Amino acid sequence: MQHLDIAELVRSALEVSGCDPSLIGGIDSHSTIVLDLFALPSICISVKDDDVWIWAQLGADSMVVLQQRAYEILMTIMEGCHFARGGQLLLGEQNGELTLKALVHPDFLSDGEKFSTALNGFYNYLEVFSRSLMR
């Protein structure tokens, strides 16, 4: 895989999505990039071993709620995810919190427009999962 400038890719994706460039601060490509959202958990973007992950921690109480909403959540995951490698989102536990993750398919890393598709898609899933877990 050729060198990926994740900071520039994220900046471009945010601009393509309509974010005012003056609202985008300095982005450090050497650490996890965190996009703070209103009324939703932050979206994190990180690179590990040349793979790009988009993820969000859904909250400490989410593990308990997961037991109550497992069927609904599983059905959402089984719908598939076009921008994720393997076509599936992942749920895991990280630091005691339920975490929604997507390993971004390389086809969505070539430019800001394609990455914005992945980023916006993840945002939409985050809304669905947050709504399910916060009911």
Curated annotation (Swiss-Prot):
The keyword Glycosyltransferase does not apply. This is Surface presentation of antigens protein SpaK. It comes from the Bacteria. The lineage of its organism: Bacteria, Pseudomonadati, Pseudomonadota, Gammaproteobacteria, Enterobacterales. NCBIfam families: PRK15336.1 (NF011864). It comes from Salmonella typhimurium (strain LT2 / SGSC1412 / ATCC 700720). It holds the Pfam family Invas_SpaK. Homodimer. Involved in a secretory pathway responsible for the surface presentation of determinants needed for the entry of Salmonella species into mammalian cells. Chaperone specialized in the storage of effectors within the bacterial cytoplasm, maintaining them in a secretion-competent state, and allowing their immediate delivery to target cells upon contact of the bacterium with the host cells. Has been shown to chaperone SopA, SopE, SopE2 and SipA. Belongs to the SpaK family. Keywords: Chaperone, Virulence. InterPro entries: Invas_SpaK.
